[in-house]
Amino acid sequence: LDSRKAYYGADDIGITKLDFDTRDLIDEIKSIKRKYDFIIIDSPPSITFETMQVVKASDRVFVPVQPSPVDLMATLPFLKIAKQERKNPIIILNRVMPRAKLTDAMILRLRYSGAKIARSRLSSKVIFAETFSVGRGVVDISVTSDASKEVINVGNEILRNF
């Protein structure tokens, strides 16, 4: 966030990073929900006390997943918990390699898990890492680029499913 603030020269960049006590996570999230239209909580897919609290306090659960066997194995238990909590998780495929047979196999396995898979996805593009490293997003660079269109499509799909 600091590099983004430095680049744009503004205190209000539309993103707020919050730190809070994870021992009282559900109450913390409820308090935050009153102040913002959307809150995004980034957490690993592993099953921990904190992850369980985040899922319980969430209105919706969107799960970015790289279509690889390792990511799939790490994500399946998380999806099970989200479904048990009736959050109807939606998978957003991330770092997708076009025309990769592995991608098709992983999509098939994710469908078998019963989770909904978003139509929109993010390809594996260097530009995502490059822009992030300087505190910017791909849409900041060029709103008409393929990467920007992917991000906009994912964002629109999230809004439609909220």
What are these regions (language model features)?
Residues 132-150:
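C-terminal boundary of histidine-terminating zinc-finger modules
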Residues 97, 108-137:
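Beta-strand-loop-alpha "switch" segments that mediate conformational coupling across diverse proteins
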Residues 72-94:
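Conserved C-terminal guanine-recognition region of P-loop GTPase G domains, centered on the G4
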Residues 1-24:
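N-terminal phosphate/diphosphate-binding loop that engages ATP/GTP or pyrophosphate donors
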Residues 17-20, 29-51:
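Switch II (G3) loop of P-loop NTPases
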